Each structure stands twice: as structure tokens, then as C-alpha cells.
Amino acid sequence: MKFFVFFVLLFSIDLKSHEFNPAHLVVDQLDSEKFIYEANWMYPFKNIGKRGEIIFPDECKTESSDLYYQGKYINEKIYLDCTKSLKGLYIEVINLSVLTDALITVNFADDDTFEGIVNNKNSIIKIPIKENYLPTAYIFLGLDHLLNGF
């Protein structure tokens, strides 16, 4: 009987939750001696408002391929040809909705990795010159989401 009451109470609770589905930008340096990068911008298509857009540094020429759907995301491949490394430069994400944060991952050819988070309040992020050894941004984003309720 206690088991039955437990399940009735458990499933009668009205939970106010939504899917945690952040946007994700993954930038990979293709050559350790050249500043050529390939980026994949993954933005959830079930989102409120405009699709978020990436603003890369002025030091980079960009070329984008056509958008395509994969799973829950609209994907965009972006090719960057930069005059110098992305280290020390800024990336901006515009048009993020209140419910969508963006995880940014930059993988350099020398095995350095940077991870950071942007949102609609803090839309610009600086890629540090020194590497980020612990890629914890996604973990902290999830914890913040759980603890703050959005």
C-alpha cells in the first residue's frame, strides 16, 4: 500500500520543467601553422525568436555553408581564414533568447582547448591566450539551470 501511495504522490506532482537544450559553437583549428578554422554552429530549432548568429573577429574572413537540420538543431558550417590566432580575440553571439545559452568550444591544433558560455546578457566572450585546462562550462551551465529553475 505504501508503494502505491508513493507512486500516486510522485506522479501527481505538477513539475514545471522544460528541456535543457543550449546552443553550441564548436571551432576546430585545421592546421597548427595556419589560422584556418572550421566551425559548427548548432542552434536549437524549437526556440523563441530569431536564430542566434555568430560574430567572429574582424581578423577572420568567414564563409558559411547552407543550413541543415540534424536532430534538434539547425546546423551551420562556417569556415574561417584568420590573419592571426583566435587566442586573445573575441567572439560574439547575437539574438540569443532568454531561455537559450550558448556553449562555445575552441579546439586549437596544438591541443589547447577553450570552453565558455554566452547568453543574452553577456553575449561577448574573450578567448584567453592560455589554455583552459578543465572544460567545465557545460557542467556549470547545467547546475545553474537546475538551481535557478530556468
What is each PLM-predicted segment?
Residues 2-13:
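Sec-dependent N-terminal signal peptides
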Residues 15-147:
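Histidine-/acidic- and/or cysteine-rich, low-complexity loops and terminal segments associated
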